[in-house]
Regions:
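Short, amphipathic alpha-helical "recognition" segments used to contact nucleic acids or chromatin
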Residues: 242-256
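C-terminal/domain-terminus segments
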Residues: 207-231
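Short glycine-/polar-rich loops that comprise or flank the Walker A/P-loop
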Residues: 3-5, 26-31, 70-73, 134-136, ...
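Conserved nucleotide-binding/hydrolysis micro-motifs of P-loop NTPases
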Residues: 4-8, 14-16, 37-42, 108-110, ...
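Inter-lobe coupling/hinge region of RecA-like P-loop helicase motors
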Residues: 28-36, 57-106, 136
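Conserved helicase motor "Helicase C" RecA-like lobe of SF1/SF2 P-loop NTPases
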Residues: 109-128
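Conserved helicase C-terminal RecA-like lobe
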Residues: 96-100, 135, 143-210, 219
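Conserved RecA-like helicase ATPase core segment
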Residues: 1-71, 166, 217
Length: 256
């Protein structure tokens, strides 16, 4: 049992081909698709499904909600960098106090600006911000997989080296230990974005800098602006080989 739409751990050795090409590895196979979601409804069901299935390498599915009356919205908010924290505060204030909220970031440092304006609380491995008197958990999208909240606020969906999608390229030496990368532009990042926007039961709110919207944001709001050039990475977006990466390579080698 698995979901190739949510395969987001290539960096730790996950190989989507083992799932998508299962019959080639294990022979005669019967495939049964689970196409009912119990977390969210329309229009998010259709919007998220169309988004992830732009990559034809993903297994094609016809997802539907268990209830035709269930509604889950997907909204986008452009912010001015000077008013970024206030924008988040206003969004939080607009959400009923009895509803749960996640703040999600592509990177663990996507909450950087929040730390200047709002009180933070660390409880074990969990991290919160106090916004408008409410304690709201901040997580990376990777950590949020499998979790859910009534509302999700997705931070910093900008076109940047460390934006969403991330433009950072793996060092070529990692190809010796990691599985073959997705040939579809930003394939893994697309799956990660799908995971992010589908954590919500009521509404996902996507924040982006009005000057530098992510190509993923443009796919939803301005598809006419999207071209092949939109997916070209900046030539300087290369991950440097570091001592920690060297240790990671050695760990994978020792584990076989």
């Amino acid at each position: 049992v698995g979901d190739d739409w949510q395969s987001i751990y290539r960096f730790s050795g996950s190989d989507m081909a083992l799932f998508n090409q299962f019959p080639e590895y294990f022979g005669t196979t019967e495939i049964n698709k689970i196409e009912t979601t119990y977390r969210f409804g329309e229009p998010l069901v259709s919007l998220s499904s169309n988004f992830i299935q732009r990559n034809k390498a993903q297994i094609q599915k016809n997802i539907h909600s268990f209830s035709s009356e269930m509604r889950t919205e997907l909204e986008f908010y452009a912010y001015d960098r000077r008013d970024y924290c206030n924008t988040i505060g206003q969004l939080v204030a607009s959400i009923p106090s009895d509803k749960s909220i996640f703040l999600l970031g592509r990177y663990s440092f996507d909450d950087y600006y929040l730390s200047f304006m709002y009180q933070s609380i660390k409880e074990g491995n969990r991290f919160y911000y106090v916004i408008g008197g409410r304690k709201i958990e901040f997580l990376t999208v990777h950590k949020s997989k499998g979790l859910e909240a009534n509302y999700v606020i997705l931070l910093q969906c900008n076109k940047d080296t460390y934006g969403f999608p991330s433009q950072v390229s793996d060092d070529p030496v990692l190809n010796y230990v990691l599985t073959k990368s997705d040939q579809f532009p930003y394939g893994e990042e697309r799956r990660l974005f799908y995971v992010a926007i589908t954590r919500a039961k009521i509404k996902t709110l996507v924040l982006y800098d009005k000057r530098f919207p992510s190509v993923f944001v443009d796919e939803f709001l301005h598809p006419e602006k999207v071209s092949e050039e939109s997916y070209v990475k900046h030539p300087n977006a290369n991950k440097r080989w570091t001592r920690s990466a060297d240790q990671f390579l050695l760990k994978l080698h020792n584990e076989g």
